[in-house]
Amino acid sequence: MSRITKEEIEKTKCGRFLLSDENIYLSIYSLNSYVFEYNLLNTEDRILYHRLQDKFDARLINGVITRVREQIIELFDKDKYIEAKVYFKPKKLSENGELEFRPLHSTGLITQIAIVSMLHLFVYEIPEEEEGDPKLRLSNLSRLIPSDFYGNRVSVKPEYLFKPWKQQYQKYNQNSNDALMKYHTSLEYKYEVTLDLENFFPTINPIIIYRYIINHLPAYLNDEERKMMKRVLQKLLFCKLTTTFDEKTAGQYYKVTKGAGNYDNVDKIEQNEKECWAFKEKSDKFVRGIPQGLPQSYFLGNIYMISIAEIFRKKFTGVSYFYVDDSVIFTNDVREDNFKEQLKELNKQIADEANNFEDDSAIYPEGTEKFYKSDLYGVNVHLDGKSNYTRLDNLDDSEVYLKCISREMSQAGSDFFRMYSDEENRNLEEKLDVLSKQVKAKRDQLVEEKSQKRDSGNEDAIEKDEDDTQKFEKRLTRYYRFFEYRKQRLVAMHQPENGSDEDYNMQLY
């Protein structure tokens, strides 16, 4: 692929739309909805981000449109790719006590606007050029996203690239909680299955998404239009990595997970990682998998999940809910004595599905074929711990309540680290206050019921329920502390707004 000029790009309808002022302005207008990692922007880009909140500063907007257009044209050069840095965000402690990290990618603000301008070709229908004031319409690809996918759904409101994640995550939690309570009562489905994909974004082979999208482009596109779409898609999928690793960070980034359960020992896994690292030292570094943190990754992740979700639904028929790579399924198809084998069968079906996609080395950036065909790639379901099932007929009302609250904890924890404004801060503070009071009321109710049982003198009933009640009470206390601590930290963040230290201390304590 040699570099082409602006005039050559604009020979196609999709090329004219790509470079148009209207398309690039739309990317600027929806800026707040896709800059997911604001704190990773440099100072200059943060200033530009805030200046771009004024969507009617014509001089600034026109200057940004020109810079974005130039960057898009530059990316059509054969050897030019989106350049990204990777940062490691603490994720959890492993079973052996080591801290694990999630790799998050970031790039300049102009580049992110260029990415979204390119992504528009795939998420929206390209409007007819004679349309005076075209409305946003979802593309064929966007309409393929199943209705039970809640995360990162494309919006047709110009101020949002994706539907607001908070509302969508809340819907996911609320609907799955409602289903839990419904099927716990009716037992139409006897099991709740939760499936977790291991190291999801880094283990997606971009070639699979490339083939899926190309196979689902509109049939009416002529050869030149399809060629243009392929070129843009390749630039969205393959990103250069500008971060320099030491051995420790390289081990985190290039950690092998594909088929890890099939290795005889840890030494083989470590040797595989060293081979991948040695290869990376000798070549231009490219982002592993899909670059989580950049705007295109979440739409591309949903596209990949379409076939994964279909495999899940066939294995566990019933009612399902998906949020990116998290899933909850209510089903009757669990083999209790052989659940792990069912998970292994899922992994085999996922691998078989991946092998069905035609490979083409010409699609890979030059010199990267070995990297993209290595054992770094291959999405797997966790075989232990995170993927599990729960028998609904074995749950009492208190356990159903705890499962629902645990989902609220997950959402609140995510909200806490993704606030960018005082308004979001206060909204979350109010939500945490409500949750804290609800849990405290439930805990107080439990203590009162326990006291009444003791007063009744029914020793058999007391002894029978004591252990379960104590466990329930401890978990409620832990949840209460979780919500209350985060609420108090939010109060502390805006102490100056609260007036005197006395007022502040009253709120805090």
Regions found by a protein language model. Give the residues of each.
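Extended charged low-complexity segments that act as oligomerization/scaffolding linkers
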Residues: P158-Q170, N177, Y183, L346-N356, ...
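A generic structural signal for well-ordered alpha-helical segments enriched in polar/charged residues
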Residues: H120, Y124, N215, S307-K314, ...
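Inter-domain linker/hinge segments that demarcate the starts of reverse transcriptase
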Residues: V64-D77, F339-E358, D375
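An acidic- and aromatic-residue-enriched active-site/binding cleft used to recognize and process polar
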Residues: K89-K92, L109, L197-F200, Y323-V334, ...
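Conserved polymerase palm-domain catalytic core
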Residues: Y183-V324, V328-Q342, E429-Y509
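Conserved two-metal-ion catalytic palm core of "right-hand" nucleic acid polymerases
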Residues: M1-T244, F279-R288, T469
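Nucleotidyltransferase catalytic cores
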Residues: M1-E74, E100-F101, S106-Q112, V123-Y124, ...
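Surface-exposed helix-capping loop/turn segments at secondary-structure junctions
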Residues: E128, K314-Y321, N356-A362
